[in-house]
């Protein structure tokens, strides 16, 4: 019996079997969430994406981001207010939208105004990268709203690592506001804002918006990777 246990334990320790076990555990977690979670796969046309490089000068817009191949534009025409900050030390990050940011020293609430399609399901992604752009060594903490409703609290806890917030949302009108709300002494910032229209069958939900709960990358046993996204109402 002990020999069998030792053999089973040794098999689990192999990299391939550990990957299989990880995938099985992940599958069980997803099943356990039942109707409150789904795997999200965006099969939209990239031409329908909204990709804003926040703080990008209009003269440098648009551009094709080398790592993703997506076309980014300046956020200049989508928000009133805010100032442009440039990250001097990006911590080795190669993602181009992290090189600049927009920060909001004035006002309590600063909102992006975006044109969307009413009733369409969107994956909304907001990226925040501090990089000590102001030299003050003060990590920002503030709230993020969808219109008048609370989305999440953005608590940036690392200087040189991006903070990413994601949510699935169905706008009820053709206009969508994404607002940064100052809640303390630190200054709200944002590096990038991305919207992806999703297929209606990507996630079936009747309880409003769905905030990202977890993300996991698992091997597909062929050489690539599969991204699993778990969203919670």
Label every model-predicted segment.
Residues 2-233:
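Compositionally biased, intrinsically disordered or flexible polar/acidic segments
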């Amino acid at each position: 019996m002990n020999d069998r246990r030792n053999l089973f334990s040794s098999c689990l320790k192999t990299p391939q079997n550990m990957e299989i076990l990880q995938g099985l555990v992940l599958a069980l977690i997803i099943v356990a969430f039942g109707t409150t979670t789904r795997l999200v796969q965006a099969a939209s046309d990239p031409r329908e994406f909204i990709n804003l490089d926040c703080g990008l000068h209009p003269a440098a817009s648009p551009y094709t981001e080398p790592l993703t191949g997506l076309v980014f534009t300046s956020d200049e025409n989508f928000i009133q207010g805010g100032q442009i900050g440039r990250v001097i030390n990006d911590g080795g990050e190669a993602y181009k939208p992290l090189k600049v940011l927009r920060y909001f020293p004035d006002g309590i609430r600063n909102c992006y105004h975006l044109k969307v399609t009413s009733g369409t399901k969107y994956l909304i992604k907001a990226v925040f990268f501090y990089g000590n752009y102001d030299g003050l060594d003060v990590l920002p903490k503030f709230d993020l709203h969808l219109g008048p409703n609370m989305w999440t609290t953005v608590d940036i806890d690392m200087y040189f690592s991006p903070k990413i917030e994601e949510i699935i949302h169905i706008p009820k009108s053709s206009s969508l506001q994404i607002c940064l709300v100052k809640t303390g002494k630190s200054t709200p910032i944002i590096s990038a804002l991305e919207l992806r229209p999703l297929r209606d069958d990507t996630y079936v939900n009747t309880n409003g918006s769905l905030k990202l709960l977890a993300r996991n990358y698992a091997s597909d046993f062929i050489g690539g990777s599969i991204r699993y996204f778990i969203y919670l109402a």
